[in-house]
């Protein structure tokens, strides 16, 4: 008897599962979506023309974004070149230089650097000829590479320490009118920088129509001490010094470099010449 009851219960198990499965299917078959009929939809007519508007909006005008404070001192991707970049490269840490002259051994000591003297003065303010600053910033922007000034202003002590030859004692580094430099990443391509300098005078509006500034000539005399004939216009004199030329204490690197001298002062409309009073008596000593 007990065995028959167990057998009947086992036979009923599949039937129970069938009933549960059926209930599950029927409960999921109903849809929750409501059916919309055309009569239940409403609309609203628009009573205006396409050009009509309730709010008058002024036409948009392009306004150039103001520069951030830190951007004002940028020249391309690098800090803007100022007169401070031209400070004398001398330092009292440099060793004494011994130079054998015809009759004696001469000792040359370097200056104390910017901590001991100022740049040249104009109207009692430190001064470097603006064309040098403008040119170097222009090069830095156009190339997006750093301009390295190897020699800007030289005080008399540093000047003779760098090069004691008599002819070097009358250069325009002494009066803030000359600069030696190269461009990082273009050290061995100075011709590209020369082309940029020539183009500068074509692009700047203030030189437009001024033939003496826009046209460069080549210096034909043999006293330039370089193998490449220099370029010049009314304002500047440009020299290419190859890596086998023009080495001194400030230019001990192995690259060719460029030298720009100022010939003409745009502001005063006068030629720029070396003078002893400017070189030796026109800067502060501390």
Language-model-derived ranges and their functions:
Residues 169-178, 182-286:
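Catalytic cores and adjacent binding grooves of peptidoglycan-active enzymes
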Residues 137-164:
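Extended, low-complexity, intrinsically disordered C-terminal regulatory tails
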Residues 28-30:
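N-terminal Sec signal peptide cleavage junction
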Residues 86-144:
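Active-site acidic/histidine clusters and adjacent loop/turn architecture
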Residues 34-71:
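N-terminal module-boundary/linker segments of secreted carbohydrate-active enzymes
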Residues 1-12:
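N-terminal secretory signal peptides that target proteins for export/translocation
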Residues 103-118, 163-168, 172-176, 186-190:
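Acidic/His-rich structured neighborhood in mature extracellular/periplasmic domains
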Residues 16-26:
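Bacterial N-terminal signal peptides
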């Amino acid at each position: 008897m007990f065995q028959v009851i167990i057998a009947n219960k086992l036979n009923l198990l599949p039937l129970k599962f069938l009933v549960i499965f059926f209930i599950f299917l029927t409960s999921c078959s109903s849809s929750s979506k409501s059916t919309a009929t055309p009569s239940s939809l409403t609309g609203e007519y628009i009573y205006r023309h396409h050009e009509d508007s309730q709010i008058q909006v002024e036409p948009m005008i392009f306004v150039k974004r103001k520069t951030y404070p830190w951007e004002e001192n940028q020249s391309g991707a690098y800090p803007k070149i100022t007169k401070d970049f031209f400070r004398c490269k001398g330092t009292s840490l440099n060793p004494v230089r011994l130079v054998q002259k015809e009759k004696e051994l001469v000792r040359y000591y370097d200056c104390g650097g910017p901590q001991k003297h100022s740049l040249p003065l104009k109207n009692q303010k430190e001064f470097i000829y603006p064309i040098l600053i403008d040119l170097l910033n222009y090069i830095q922007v156009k190339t997006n590479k750093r301009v390295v000034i190897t020699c800007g202003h030289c005080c008399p002590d540093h000047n003779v320490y760098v090069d004691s030859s008599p002819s070097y004692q009358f250069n325009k580094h002494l009066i803030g009118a000359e600069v030696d430099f190269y461009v990082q990443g273009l050290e061995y391509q100075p011709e590209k920088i020369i082309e940029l300098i020539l183009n500068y005078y074509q692009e700047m509006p203030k030189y437009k129509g001024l033939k003496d500034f826009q046209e460069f000539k080549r210096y034909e005399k043999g006293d330039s001490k370089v193998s490449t004939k220099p370029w010049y216009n009314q304002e500047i004199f440009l020299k290419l010094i190859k890596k086998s030329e023009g080495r001194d204490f400030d230019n001990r690197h192995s690259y060719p470099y460029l030298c720009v001298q100022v010939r003409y002062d745009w502001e005063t409309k006068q030629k720029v010449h070396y003078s002893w009073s400017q070189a030796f008596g026109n800067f502060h000593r501390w």
